[in-house]
């Protein structure tokens, strides 16, 4: 199977007061302030949950003077429409303005927005609850440096900070039909569930080491999705498929048994196709959308 990576770049325009959607400037304040104009895209795939921004999606933006926010931290910008190209506007009282003296500032951003962060810039992550997926799809944008009121356009590029699992379940068509698999649940064992991410300094999310848990993934029919934390090793992790139509029989697959699933790499998406028969489970995998996680695909058997 050839290595696959679906490279997409969906742009979302962030419109702040002082700029209209058609690109024509509205009147600026008389005190000489200039409003930030920002665009944002997401590397590889535009959204963790799917390929569109959804109405109500919000990002947080920080304007930095060195390491200080000068009161311009965690400003909220929200989109009112569901579209591949979303327009974002500042919430009331959230507009960021450049200094009137044309001094330079830096900018960072993150998604999804939260009103309150620990110490003002530390985003806490908890993946123990998987629904809705978009609420735990943490993304950060690298710092954009050296902007001022004479050059107010800031382009953010977001990257995924966690790991996506995308699982398709199907019957072998001989001993079982898809109808027999109705209600199948999927879980993954041996998971850390807590992490922190500094939205100002960026970099990787920091996993908080604690007691591991089994996470029940979000299911929709014969599809299952999960967002989990990065892991240097997948040793001890197993996917479990519990089928009510087979008297609750459970099938297990050792994630670490696949050559390219030895680790869960941040920003990677791992796709698994699970074929279930009365004799057992066959697993194949490939990668799409996010940065390649398990290459061109893998196979395995579950018992």
UniProtKB/Swiss-Prot annotation:
Source species, domain of life: Bacteria
A GO term from the CC aspect: pilus
Compartments, as annotated in UniProt: Fimbrium
Alphabetical list of InterPro entries matching this protein: Mfa-like_1, Mfa-like_1_N
Entry keyword annotation includes Transmembrane helix: no
Signal peptide extent: 1-22
Alphabetical keyword list: Fimbrium, Signal
Subunit annotation: May be part of the fimbrial tip.
Family: Belongs to the bacteroidetes fimbrillin superfamily. Mfa-like family.
Job of this protein: Putative component of the fimbrium tip. Fimbriae are filamentous appendages on the cell surface that mediate cell adhesion and biofilm formation.
Name recorded for this polypeptide: Putative fimbrium subunit Fim1C
């Amino acid at each position: 199977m050839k290595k696959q990576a679906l490279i997409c770049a969906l742009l979302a325009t962030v419109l702040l007061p002082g700029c209209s959607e058609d690109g024509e400037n509205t009147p600026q304040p008389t005190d000489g302030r200039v409003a930030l104009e920002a665009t944002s895209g997401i590397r590889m795939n535009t959204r963790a949950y799917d390929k569109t921004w959804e109405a109500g999606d919000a990002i947080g933006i920080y304007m930095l003077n060195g390491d200080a926010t000068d009161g311009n931290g965690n400003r909220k910008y929200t989109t009112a429409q569901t579209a591949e190209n979303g327009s974002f506007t500042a919430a009331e009282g959230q507009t960021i303005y450049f200094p009137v003296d044309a001094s330079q500032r830096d900018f960072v951003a993150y998604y999804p927005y939260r009103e309150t962060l620990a110490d003002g810039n530390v985003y806490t992550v908890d993946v123990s609850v998987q629904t809705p997926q978009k609420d735990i799809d943490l993304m950060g944008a690298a710092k954009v440096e050296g902007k001022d009121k004479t050059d107010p356009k800031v382009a953010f590029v977001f990257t995924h900070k966690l790991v996506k699992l995308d699982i398709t379940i199907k019957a072998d068509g001989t001993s079982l039909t898809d109808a027999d698999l109705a209600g199948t649940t999927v879980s993954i064992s041996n998971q850390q569930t807590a992490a922190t991410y500094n939205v100002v300094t960026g970099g990787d999310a920091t996993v908080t080491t604690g007691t591991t848990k089994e996470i029940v993934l979000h299911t929709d029919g014969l599809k299952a999705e999960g967002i989990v934390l990065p892991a240097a090793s997948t040793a001890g992790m197993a996917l479990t498929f519990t089928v009510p139509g087979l008297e609750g029989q459970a099938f297990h697959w050792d994630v670490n048994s696949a050559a390219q699933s030895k680790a869960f790499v941040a920003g990677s998406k791992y796709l698994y196709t699970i074929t279930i028969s009365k004799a057992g489970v066959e697993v194949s995998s490939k990668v799409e959308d996010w940065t390649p996680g398990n290459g061109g695909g893998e196979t395995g058997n579950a018992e």
